[in-house]
Amino acid sequence: MTIPTYHITIADKIKAYRNENNLSLKEFGKLIGVSAQAVCKWEQNICYPDIIFLPHLARILECRVDDFFEEL
């Protein structure tokens, strides 16, 4: 199974933001309203954020929702 490029883009943005801001998985999850386990799965491309989280993720990551899909 091939993971679509946009999943990788979202994962990379989340991981970079967490690293730049020294946030743990748990701390970032609290910002979004999800568990640390969910964030970990997003970063590892095991699964991806539900569409309802994308606007909130975009605000936190200071990007637009369509930036998550820029490589499609």
PLM region spans:
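A short, Lys/Arg-rich alpha-helix, primarily the initiator
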Residues: 1-20
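Residue-level signal for the short linker/turn that defines the boundary of a DNA-recognition helix
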Residues: 12, 22-23, 49-52
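Short alpha-helical DNA-recognition segment
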Residues: 22-41, 56
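A secondary-structure capping/hinge motif
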Residues: 32, 47-48
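Short, conserved catalytic or interaction motifs in soluble domains
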Residues: 44
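DNA major-groove recognition helix of helix-turn-helix/homeodomain DNA-binding modules
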Residues: 52-67
